[in-house]
Amino acid sequence: MIINAKGPASFAEKYIVRSIWDNKFPPGSILPAERELSELIGVTRTTLREVLQRLARDGWLKIQHGKPTRVNNFWETSGLNILETIADLNPEGFPVLVDQLLSARTNVSAIYFRGALRYNPDTAVDVLAKIHQLEDTAESYAEFDYLLHHTLAFSSGNPLYVLILNGFKGLYSRVGRYYFTSSDARLLALNFYKELEVLAQAKNYLDVPALMRTYGMNSGKMWLQLRDDMPASIAQYN
């Protein structure tokens, strides 16, 4: 098992998570005793204890006082916060993970974009006004796209959408910086922003779902043209 880590705690965390992913520690199994596991990994018991607590908070493990630590089925117990970890664990499946991520974000964003234009159209107008000074670079587009989604999610009348979006942030930001290296992708996005701005100025939230659906289909086709050339390093979060 080859693990790149920045320190003992990072190494221990990646070792345990990789072992769970590879079914060395399968769901429902009991982790080795603390002393045995710390010797196996090569870290102090104090470091291991901190790592186990962190992994339990993320849903990988179940820790109960006086009982051995049990491995969870992370698909049932974890949240969006492990997306980055899954990408790092399974680089071969990363393009499919991104497909699923983009599909999920498109479906959810249609709801909060409509909500924002319905309940806070002036906020939508203000953030969309920034497109007229948007630099034609991948970095600028990726940053603005996240700003737009974050602002409209918060203004939709249901701030829980912001928490969902935050779960996508790190992974989506890296993918976005790659996606927007395409001038065609930037032009497609700019036209979408302009159409959305017109709807916001008119306080027309009813036509948002149709616009989102069209842009989702077109950007999905664009992504399929770009994803095979995506650098493998994008899957790595540290």
Curated annotation (Swiss-Prot):
GO molecular function, one term: DNA-binding transcription factor activity
HTH gntR-type domain residues: 6-74
Listed name of the protein: Fatty acid metabolism regulator protein
Annotation: DNA-binding region: 34-53
UniProt cross-references to InterPro entries, sorted A to Z: FA-response_TF_FadR, FadR_C, TF_FadR/GntR_C, Tscrpt_reg_HTH_GntR, WH-like_DNA-bd_sf, WH_DNA-bd_sf
Primary localization class, coarse: cytoplasm
Places the protein is found: Cytoplasm
Pfam family, one: FadR_C
Keywords assigned by UniProt, alphabetized: Activator, Cytoplasm, DNA-binding, Fatty acid metabolism, Lipid metabolism, Repressor, Transcription, Transcription regulation
Coiled-coil boundaries: none
Lineage of the organism: Bacteria, Pseudomonadati, Pseudomonadota, Gammaproteobacteria, Alteromonadales
Species of origin: Shewanella baltica (strain OS155 / ATCC BAA-1091)
Domain of life: Bacteria
Gene encoding the protein: fadR
